[in-house]
């Protein structure tokens, strides 16, 4: 099932009983976080707050609060089907030459479909039904959440930031939080390694002192939102990938004040510029770590124009100690990552990002070990293959007899198959999330790899232990007798 815009997705969720309309007045200041947090932990529905206190614009929360809704937003009926999306991305990222004419013809429809998904640019769009410019711009009219008691102010969380570098044809889509600091100003908190920050840096080098155009789309369709957080190959735009998920081309419209193109069906679009050198202190805010982050300086985005639909819906979320919405998103996207990694490392059996590890800070890999040192090759591959794992601090690698998603299994492997000195890999001075205050330097820290595999000759001089295995005949006999024993 696919959805043409956010409103279509809301309607379909409501038909499935997966969305609840809240007509009791609830404040965007702290109260929505409490309601959404309780609902998410109960695996409850998406929430549409129709009467946010002090505002006449409804707020959509907990949209991706279950892995099933994430899968649905990506055009899949269940989480398991996300593996097929991962296989498609793996093939597009590392295409194999056809084995023959028959194989070439078999692959042709896939590549034809990719080529046919170039975005469609419209002249008029729903996101520009209402235009507010200059002195009419007032971000205070948006029901932006203040999520936690120690937050410094309102925070835009689900903004889809659109940028383009001066040397690139394709645009970059990224989701970066934005602190509202004035009627027409927000702080753009993008980390230095992210696409938007890299585009901005290149602009400043090529056009020193010149304002940098930026657009932020709020309330885009689910395929476009999720396309922005998926490991799309550099040769494929996020808009084209969203078209593949949706089954039809992404519709875009040119911004009123720049050449940037934004989703035509977005609820709200913020257009404006970043003036090089204009910076501000961002934070503190409660974050996905479960702590308030330290204050740091980031560029200021000046909003020159707000375009929107008639009676728009404001899409929002909160971040906190897992489980939160980004953690649930990570659980679902985990299934997309597995085939991509397996394409490069066929020996990988499973890959798991535990949500309690803040979605990306720890990874567990199970593999079919083939030679001494193999586990170390795999852990180094995880850190280097996808940008999404740049900030992963811990990689645990173990054998394929272990369930990567069962901590009982994983801990048993660590404690019985590891020698701390021999089997621990430490790498210093690597990129780390700036929100990770445990690192000694902001944005720079260490990584640890744990080799919890069986050790081969060359890795140990000792005879390796044999795992205890029950006698199958005895197990079958006790199965047959069990009901007569009166134990349960």
Curated annotation (Swiss-Prot):
Active site: 287
Cofactor binding, note field: Binds 1 prenylated FMN per subunit.
Reactions accelerated catalytically: a 4-hydroxy-3-(all-trans-polyprenyl)benzoate + H(+) = a 2-(all-trans-polyprenyl)phenol + CO2
The organism's place on the tree of life at top rank: Bacteria
Keywords: Cell membrane, Decarboxylase, Flavoprotein, FMN, Lyase, Manganese, Membrane, Metal-binding, Ubiquinone biosynthesis
SUPFAM superfamilies to which the protein is assigned, alphabetical: FMN-binding split barrel (SSF50475), UbiD C-terminal domain-like (SSF143968)
InterPro entries with a match to the protein in the record: UbiD, UbiD-like_C, UbiD-like_N, UbiD_bacteria, UbiD_Rift_dom
Catalytic class of the enzyme: lyase
Family in the record: Belongs to the UbiD family.
Function as written in the Swiss-Prot or TrEMBL entry: Catalyzes the decarboxylation of 3-octaprenyl-4-hydroxy benzoate to 2-octaprenylphenol, an intermediate step in ubiquinone biosynthesis.
Protein name (Swiss-Prot/TrEMBL): 3-octaprenyl-4-hydroxybenzoate carboxy-lyase
Naturally occurring in which organism (per UniProt): Pseudomonas aeruginosa (strain ATCC 15692 / DSM 22644 / CIP 104116 / JCM 14847 / LMG 12228 / 1C / PRS 101 / PAO1)
Encoding gene, per UniProt annotation: ubiD
């Amino acid at each position: 099932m696919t959805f043409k815009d956010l409103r279509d997705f809301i309607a379909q969720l409501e038909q499935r009983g997966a969305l609840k309309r809240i007509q009791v007045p609830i404040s965007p200041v702290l109260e929505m976080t409490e309601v959404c947090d309780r609902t998410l932990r109960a695996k409850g529905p998406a929430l549409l707050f129709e009467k946010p206190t002090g505002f006449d614009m409804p707020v959509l929360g907990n949209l991706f609060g279950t892995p099933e809704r994430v899968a649905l937003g990506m055009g899949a009926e269940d989480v398991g089907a996300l593996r097929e999306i991962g296989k498609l991305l793996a093939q597009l990222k590392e295409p194999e030459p056809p084995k023959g004419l028959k194989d070439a013809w078999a692959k042709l429809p896939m590549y034809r479909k990719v080529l046919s998904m170039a975005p469609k640019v419209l002249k008029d769009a729903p996101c520009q039904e209402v235009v507010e410019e200059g002195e009419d711009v007032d971000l205070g009219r948006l029901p932006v959440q203040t999520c936690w008691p120690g937050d410094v102010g309102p925070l835009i969380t689900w903004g889809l930031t659109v940028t383009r570098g001066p040397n690139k044809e394709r645009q970059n889509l990224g989701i970066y939080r934005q602190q509202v600091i004035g009627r027409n100003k927000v702080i753009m908190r993008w980390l230095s390694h992210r696409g938007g920050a890299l585009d901005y840096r290149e602009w400043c080098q090529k056009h020193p002192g010149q304002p940098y155009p930026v657009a932020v789309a709020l309330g885009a369709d689910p395929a476009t939102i999720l396309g922005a957080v998926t490991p799309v190959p550099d040769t494929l735009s996020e808009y084209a990938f969203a078209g593949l998920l949706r089954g039809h081309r992404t519709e875009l419209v040119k911004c009123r004040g720049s050449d940037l193109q934004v989703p035509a069906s977005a609820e709200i679009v913020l257009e404006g510029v970043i003036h090089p050198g204009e910076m501000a202190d961002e934070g503190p805010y409660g974050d996905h770590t479960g702590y308030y982050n330290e204050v740091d300086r980031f560029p200021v985005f000046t909003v020159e124009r707000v375009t929107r639909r008639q009676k728009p819906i404001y899409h929002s979320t909160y971040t906190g100690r897992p489980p939160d919405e980004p953690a649930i998103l990570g659980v679902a996207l985990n299934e997309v990552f597995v085939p991509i990694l397996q394409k490069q490392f066929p020996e990988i059996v499973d890959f798991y990002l535990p949500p309690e590890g803040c979605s990306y800070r720890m990874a567990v890999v199970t593999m079919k070990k083939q030679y001494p040192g193999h586990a170390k090759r795999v852990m180094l591959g995880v850190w280097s293959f996808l940008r999404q794992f740049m900030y992963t601090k811990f990689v645990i690698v173990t054998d394929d007899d272990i369930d990567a998603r069962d901590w009982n299994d994983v801990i048993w492997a660590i404690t019985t198959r590891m020698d701390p000195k021999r089997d621990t890999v430490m790498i210093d001075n690597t990129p780390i999330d700036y929100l990770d205050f445990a690192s000694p330097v902001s944005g720079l820290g260490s990584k640890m790899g744990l080799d919890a595999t069986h050790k081969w000759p060359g890795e140990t001089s000792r005879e390796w232990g044999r795992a205890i295995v029950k006698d199958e005949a005895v197990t079958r006999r006790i199965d047959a007798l069990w009901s007569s024993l009166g134990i349960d």
